[in-house]
Amino acid sequence: MTKYKSTDQVMKIISDKNKIRNFGVIAHVDHGKTTMSDSLLAHSGIISPSSAGSALAMDSMKAEQERGITIVQANVTLHYQEGENDYVINMIDTPGHVDFSGRVIRSLRAIDGSVVVCDAVEGIMTQTETVTRMSLEERVRPVLYINKIDRLIKELRLTPEKMQETLANVVSDFNDLIDTYAEEEYKEKWKVSIQDGSVTFGSAKDRWAINVDIMKKKGVTFKDVIDA
């Protein structure tokens, strides 16, 4: 992700439809969707890095700020650069509470892929299953972001080996959902894996995330990440 682009620069990029990506962030309530969105906004230069995680910029309604939950879906356009290529990413932050599931479905019908945010300690919860099922029913391919890794370190004080086991269990449980709800032709194709980079883990509150591709590029191990 790179810094803020002017409207003219964005318009130039989106003149090529192949440079546009649309994705939504879906999750169980309080698993860190909006905090993760804050981190992406900060990395793009839209909000201050110091306010990421507390600004809850995608929760613009007073009721959302007061209750600490997302009630209506909100969208933002971000710039992303990979190598020499520029992309425009339209991100939708969706509600996590079961009462607002209808708004999640509407968002899923406007996107290419979904990021399922899951608390590393709580794992797959009821609404995690619900929004993942919705994504699969709308033929929107999900990837997995395991959030709140800091809780495994600071609260549970797990060893790196035990943490890897915990993360593997979350991935396995998530793939069980895909096996249960995906159409037959996608059951194996859409399963996520740490090894292929479709699983990312991190701490949205602390504004970091990493997957196997990044670890290979930077030459770091899982233990290096934890020790840092």
Write out the residue ranges for each language-model feature:
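P-loop NTPase catalytic nucleotide-binding module
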Residues: 1-29, 120, 124-228
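P-loop NTPase switch module centered on the Walker A-proximal segment
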Residues: 1-118, 124, 131, 156-159, ...
